């Protein structure tokens, strides 16, 4: 955590966005991550959504309250606004609830029933400012047929989940992402213009404690 905080201190920042999997599904690191969260809040406001790891926790509601209590803006299909340098920023944080391992299989074989997020995008549409959607799953930007997020009116989607494809092969690219499978399109980088999708490779490793040609990253958006 010291390395991450040191790097953050070198970056000019107004907001910190966390797109899920902040605490793993065994919750063994909760006390450390709460302490780390307090350090983040000393540096900038934190806007947070859940990932598949948090959603698998039995004490999910308790954890959400603890994160809110330390000062995180916990967004569970909710909007929030903040003014930075006289500019209004509007967040929509999505709680997509695609956490079960059986969900991964269903998504791969095309039988998964995605949640209808249109009501939340309709709420976002009523608000002004620069609109940022926080979504754990980058593939939902374009891969969910009639429910894909890119059809809606917003500026930027920030996502994670794919760990950069875990392994990146020279001349081939990212190898695997849960939910996308082999050679995923949305593993890292930027896609589109407006709306634009930025996929972070993130800082953690989850079940596979190894990366190959795939450095962890903190994404800086100007």
Which sequence ranges carry the predicted segments?
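Short, conserved loop/helix-junction motifs that constitute active-site signature segments
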Residues: 10-11, 37-43, 124-127, 147-152
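Active-site neighborhood of phospho(di)ester-bond hydrolases with catalytic His/Asp-centered motifs
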Residues: 15-21, 45-52, 75-78, 132-135, ...
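Solvent-exposed loop/turn segments at secondary-structure junctions
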Residues: 22-25, 52-56, 80-82, 96-100, ...
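Conserved beta-sheet core of the metallophosphoesterase superfamily
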Residues: 65, 138-219
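Acidic/histidine-rich helix-loop elements
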Residues: 1-2, 22-31, 54-61, 98-112, ...
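Binuclear metal-dependent hydrolase catalytic cores centered on His/Asp/Glu-rich metal-binding motifs
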Residues: 69-72, 84-134, 141-148, 211
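Short acidic-hydrophobic surface loop/beta-edge motif
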Residues: 78-85, 187-193
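Membrane-embedded segments
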Residues: 1-75
